[in-house]
Amino acid sequence: MDAVRETENEKTFEIYFGGTYTECWSEDYSLAIRYSSRRSVTARRVDGVWRAIGGDAELCAELESASCPAAMREYFDAAATVYAAARDCVERGLPLERLRECLPVQKSAYAAAELMRLLMDDCGLKLKAALEICAECCEDCRMADADEKELLPYQPRTAHIVSVLRDVSSKQLTAVHDARSIRFRCPVGAVRSGEELRLSFRLASGKINSAALVLYGDDLDLEYAMESSGELYSAYIAPQSPAALWYCFHLDTDEGERWLCPDGSGYYGRLYSERRSGFRLTVFCRDFETPAWFRRSVMYQIFPDRFAFSDDDTASRGIEYHKSLGQTPELHKSLDEPVRYWPREFETSYSPDDFYGGTLRGIESKLPYLKELGVTCLYLNPIVEARSNHRYDSSDYLKVDPILGTNEDFTHLCVTARGMGIRIMLDGVYSHTGADSVYFNRYGAYPDTGACQGTQSPYYSWYDFRHFPDDYRCWWGFKDLPEVNERNGAWQDFVVSGEDSVVKTWLRRGASGWRLDVADELPDDTLALIRSAVKSVDPDAPVLGEVWEDAVIKESYGGRRNYALGYSLDSVMNYPFRAAALDFIHRRIDAFVLRDFLISQQMNYPAPMYYSLMNLLGTHDTDRIRTALATSTTIRGMSREDQLRLRFDDESLRLALRREKLCAVLQFAIPGVPSIYYGDEQGMCGVGDPFNRLPFREGDNELHDLYAQLANMRGANPALSTGDAVFMAYNADILLVLRYVRGGVDHFGASAENGAFLAVINRGAAQCFDVECPEEYDFGRLSGLADEFSAKIIKV
């Protein structure tokens, strides 16, 4: 590619003028162009303007003079821009089919002609493939504003391409739609019900008889006629009902039907001869909002038995209480004792009832540590009375487990935390109870009449017995976890909607929000009922659901769930983000794929939920992030014995710490609520449950300091919490995240300090980056040095 040749190891390009050319056809009808008698200048971009800095002195003088002919200057600028983009494309490891990643849309007709010449002559592309790329990158493929006679003296081959383009663009059909661009989709992203939305495509070349927008979902399939304004075809719609929808464009041509549907990115259009999956469109409730404080928060997740310990006999007294119920808890004598994962002599299977003795008073004693770390939201795994150490088998919904403390301890913790700017979110387990509970009372340990004692129990109707009392519906077949009937009126009144319900009581005791365990297991109408109950007590309390997949299009139990449409949840656990971050670090995907994933979440989640997503790297249900980064082995699903056989040498663990720093910067750079699983900021390791739930240890100060720096930077700069976001990839290794506030207001229109920050995440060798920010954001080019295997957030 002589057009993309470097000189002196700088970003300079040889631009050729005049001369003659010969078309040379091979036996297989491949075309090669031979040039002769050409003159050239060296071009370099200086302060955003292309300058002729060397080469033919006469040409340089003419190009730099005020009297330079317009056609000559336009060709020079167009050629230099096209060559720079082509080289950038090669250096970034992209195929030419993705040249649009490197070339902002060009309005110059000469740019289209010169790009076609480059693609066909220098790169060997066939005319159709070259035209498709050209249509994506250039406005004027029809050569409406081009004069080949004016161009002829400066570049005869490109002048000839003008006439070629003019001819082929009248016959060959190309169309452009980019769902990320306000030109084609306004507004971009999810829309509120009843909000007007314009969807457009540009007919870059060829002719059509008519075009229609096809809008469809689970319960509709509609067509809207589109009107044209020049090359732009548009339809205006205002969907009235919240739903996960899709759309595509139906083109009628003399040659038959064509469908403009997304390519693999999910947002860029391609023409197909048959209808394919469409572009996604989320319509959510018009009045849906999420708590502003939560969108700005930094979350810290605590497994209560393992985080902090009080210098008293709270835990030991709690152990004795559980023993009095006929249970078999064990209290470790030391934090150094290994966690138990095997069945005891009297058991046939492992029972997670070994305790280290963490307490609520212990958590309160660590509040200064959490405040210094920058935490503003504390998410506690279940704290109510239960048989197990994880407490997802609730025994008494209204009582703090005695091993942790008392209800009064909880209220005191909430008051103290709130005084330090920290709010507390509780974990609600409402799809099932424990079998050994006040409500089910399978073993008769509680004095109250439980469901297993007969129909006279006030809780009997909560459960579904197939054959009383031993055969009943239970969670995933676990007999210790009987499922409840969430549509039962008595259950709803006790747990959700009654004046003194479980949900409302804990909010009045000081909690500031709820995380709902296994939200998949709760019907949509029950989730909506919980939301209503929560908001009736505290409109500022978030409701967060455990959802492992894309919550917008999640299907379970035979239907599409409405988690993200504004009916029920404010937020979900963003496990897909964790998976994408790990895939990027382990080189299973590149920065372009990661960027596309981040854009897809930004576009498909309603903004109030998107900025509230719980962006996690680890939880009690995953292997710890440091461990996940130390190995490419998939740990989830392995037996506990096999997990313990995994060995990590010092080098692997050191590498994992470096990798975790990259993940942490990414986590704090994107919109949403960054969540730290206790101890991850100290570099704690651990495979799956229960080895990811070990007692908290202080360890890596450098890692801790990074998390504190990131959290406090986010807290001090609205741009990093509720500012707008732009995602870019320089090459396979470098991801860029631009966050900014302009005009004194954030994404939600709230008053906010102006500012802009750029996160640079580089998983590869040290290298310079230089990218053009999308035109609509008006940030121009962003460039700098990315150190080897590093991540940083810099002020722009």
What would you call each of these model-derived segments?
Residues 696-730:
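Aromatic- and carboxylate-lined catalytic core of secreted/periplasmic carbohydrate-active enzymes
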